């Protein structure tokens, strides 16, 4: 406990030192602009169409659109360990959006994390990944967003605790952590792999959720795509080894990224938005490239579901977890966990059950999952949450039953683990 306090104090000291240095640098280097003329962008239709495709590949709408709000008008609240950050309006409204931004201003934000007024952005806007974007692609996205309908939606003020609310401190943070490229999590050299690396590491910024983060919120680039719990639902390990260990292979990943339901899993929570707003719109060639990068030029074979120890399996099948499954889950998922195609996910070999960390399974059990529509007219019916029906011990028992019987895991979920997630 004392060590943790010392670590936190050291972190604050580092931040404060960075703030002091940054303020000095900022006074000399940051040339901010306010006011200015409204930009009129008359871009060719082909460039706007290309920009739309790239904006979808970059998943801009997922963050810059609030639930039930206008697309790209901002307002989405993003929770972090440092406070709440609100996504901004990036429609061409001159007063609330980026209507006065030039293409150079837009590029500076994507590449350097600097706003038009010279203030640093927080890395909730993933310039840490977008830094690898080509200028041509940035200009195409700019041409697209400047054709959107201007929305007079005011931006909400970011709410961070001291000293993280001092934006100039981000200059010091950038000096420490901003790099020109993000390491690859797989091995390859083919044209498809190279394109997939750009789609995953730059446009799609997969590492912003799937890469572990350090004490000051920086991506731990020594562990790219190894998984991290940035929010309530964890982003799992999507390295080649991590994907293969849960039964994923190229064909099922292609289907999953294009449709949201494929092979051993279906998308929910934030990943559902990624599928619907972004990866479903990729061309077949880019879909294949993304999969090639995620698995590498020489993909590892998908691991078969390991057989459960007969004694452990017998105990699970005759225990209270099975009783609760039959009472609460079997009506939809079936007694044998086979689910219903395009309606209820199958549990046998399910990717979430095969995760070593039970977090996502427990969150789904406690919170439930709302109805989800997917491309190609597929949809999954709502799953109710059982937080009010299951005690911590019962939820742990049910999770252990599911993981042992259909996930190849050990019955090691404890009641305390459930309690921590309530």
Question: PLM features: residue spans?
Answer:
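N-terminal type II signal-anchor transmembrane helix
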Residues: 1-35
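Flexible coil segments in periplasmic/lumen-exposed cytochrome c-class electron-transfer proteins
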Residues: 24, 28-38, 65-84, 116-197, ...
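Asp/Glu-centered strand-loop micro-motifs enriched in Gly/Pro and often flanked by an aromatic residue
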Residues: 36-43, 93-95
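Short extracytoplasmic
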Residues: 42-77
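The feature marks the first
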Residues: 59-62, 80-88, 92-132, 136-137, ...
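Short cysteine-rich clusters marking metal-coordination/redox-active sites
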Residues: 60, 206, 329
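C-terminal structural cap/anchor segments
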Residues: 320-360
């Amino acid at each position: 406990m004392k060590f943790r306090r010392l670590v936190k104090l050291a972190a604050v000291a580092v931040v404060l030192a960075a703030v002091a240095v940054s303020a000095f640098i900022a006074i000399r280097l940051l040339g901010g602009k306010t006011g200015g003329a409204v930009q009129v962008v008359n871009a060719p239709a082909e460039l706007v169409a290309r920009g739309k495709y790239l904006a979808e590949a970059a998943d801009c709408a997922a963050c810059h659109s609030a639930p039930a709000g206008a697309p790209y008008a901002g307002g989405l609240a993003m929770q972090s360990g440092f406070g709440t950050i609100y996504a901004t309006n990036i429609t061409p409204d001159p007063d609330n959006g980026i209507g006065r931004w030039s293409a150079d201003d837009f590029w500076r934000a994507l590449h350097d994390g600097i706003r038009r007024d010279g203030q640093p952005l927080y890395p909730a806007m993933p310039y840490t990944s977008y830094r690898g974007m080509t200028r041509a692609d940035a200009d195409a996205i700019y041409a697209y967003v400047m054709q959107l309908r201007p929305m007079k939606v005011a931006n909400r003020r970011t709410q961070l605790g001291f000293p993280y609310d001092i934006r100039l401190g981000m200059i010091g943070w950038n000096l420490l952590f901003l790099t020109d490229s993000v390491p690859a999590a797989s091995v390859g050299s083919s044209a498809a792999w190279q394109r997939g690396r750009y789609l995953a590491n730059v446009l799609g910024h997969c590492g912003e959720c799937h890469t572990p983060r350090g004490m000051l919120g920086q991506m731990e680039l020594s562990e790219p795509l190894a998984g991290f719990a940035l929010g309530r639902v964890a982003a799992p390990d999507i390295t080649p080894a991590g994907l293969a260990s849960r039964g994923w292979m190229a064909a099922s990943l292609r289907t999953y990224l294009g449709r949201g339901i494929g092979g051993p899993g279906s998308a929910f929570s934030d990943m559902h938005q990624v599928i619907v707003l972004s990866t479903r719109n990729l061309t077949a060639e880019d879909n294949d490239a993304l999969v090639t990068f995620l698995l590498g030029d020489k993909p590892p074979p998908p691991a078969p579901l390991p057989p459960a120890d007969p004694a452990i399996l017998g105990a699970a099948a005759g225990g209270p977890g099975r009783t609760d499954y039959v009472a609460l889950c079997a009506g939809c998922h079936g007694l044998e966990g086979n689910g219903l195609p395009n309606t209820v996910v199958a549990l046998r070999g399910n990717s979430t059950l095969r995760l070593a960390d039970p977090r996502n399974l427990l969150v789904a059990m406690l919170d439930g999952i709302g109805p989800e529509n997917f491309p190609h007219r597929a949809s999954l019916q709502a799953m109710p949450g059982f937080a009010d029906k299951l005690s911590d011990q019962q939820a742990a028992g049910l999770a252990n039953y599911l993981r042992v019987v259909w996930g190849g895991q050990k019955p090691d979920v404890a009641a305390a683990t459930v309690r921590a997630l309530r």
